[in-house]
């Protein structure tokens, strides 16, 4: 039904949590996943044990968001080859080395019956219908209500969440912890998964110790 409004994303998250029977889940969300978690928790509809927000906060940069949209809007009718896909990714993420072996791209795309390569996401999600100013205000309000352990992870090269945007969130949520991953852009885990994973595991072991 192509319902990708922020509120529908929250409803989807609540449904997933309910389906697995998690009483107090640990939420780790990057970009849209992080903002969805923030809205769900900050509005009191989901009680989580801890939350990790990856390169997202209420104050993000429009230019960075526009770059993501431009990347997603490329080749709406599909890519002709894996090389063309790799070129698009390399243009969007110049900090990464373009892979010589393109077999790994197969998990990020699908080969359609038309012989073209398409992203896994629904192309209809590009048709944003909600008001971004109102959306960001709702994130601001949600951030004021956080009382659970929170870790904010920022990619040091990110043009979506700047250092100023991160510090603004930390002022709103002073008990939150913060990690700046140098050498990583918006796709933090993809750029520096070693540092990212280590920071998340360390945080969770401290704030939500494993049972037994």
Predicted regions and their residues:
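Helix-rich cap/lid subdomain of alpha/beta-hydrolase
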Residues: 58-121
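Conserved catalytic-core motifs of eukaryotic protein kinase domains, centered on the activation segment
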Residues: 1-3, 63-64, 163-164
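Core-facing hydrophobic residues within beta-strands of well-ordered domains
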Residues: 47-49, 173-176, 184
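Active-site loop/oxyanion-hole signature of alpha/beta-hydrolase fold enzymes
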Residues: 1-28, 198
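Catalytic histidine-centered segment of alpha/beta-hydrolase-like enzymes
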Residues: 181-197
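Glycine-rich phosphate-binding loop signature in dinucleotide/nucleotide-binding domains
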Residues: 20-23, 203, 207
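Conserved serine/cysteine hydrolase catalytic core
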Residues: 111-171, 177-180
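Conserved hydrolase catalytic core segment
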Residues: 19-62
């Amino acid at each position: 039904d192509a319902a990708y409004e922020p509120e529908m994303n929250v409803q989807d998250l609540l449904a997933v949590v309910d389906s697995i029977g998690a009483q107090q889940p640990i939420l780790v969300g990057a970009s849209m996943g992080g903002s969805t978690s923030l809205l769900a928790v900050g509005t009191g509809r989901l009680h989580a044990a801890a939350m990790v927000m990856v390169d997202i906060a209420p104050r993000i940069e429009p230019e960075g968001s526009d770059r993501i949209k431009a990347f997603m809007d490329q080749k709406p009718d599909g890519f002709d080859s894996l090389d063309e896909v790799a070129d698009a990714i390399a243009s969007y993420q110049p900090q990464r080395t373009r892979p010589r072996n393109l077999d790994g791209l197969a998990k990020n795309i699908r080969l359609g019956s038309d012989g073209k390569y398409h992203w896994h996401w629904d192309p209809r999600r590009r048709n944003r219908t909600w008001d971004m100013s109102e959306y960001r205000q709702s994130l601001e309000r949600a951030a004021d209500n956080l009382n659970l352990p929170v870790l904010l992870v920022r990619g040091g090269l990110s043009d979506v969440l700047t250092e100023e945007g991160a510090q603004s969130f930390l002022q709103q949520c002073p008990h939150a912890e913060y990690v700046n991953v140098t050498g990583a852009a918006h796709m933090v885990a993809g750029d520096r998964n070693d540092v990212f994973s280590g920071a998340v595991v360390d945080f969770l072991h401290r704030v939500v110790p494993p049972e037994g």
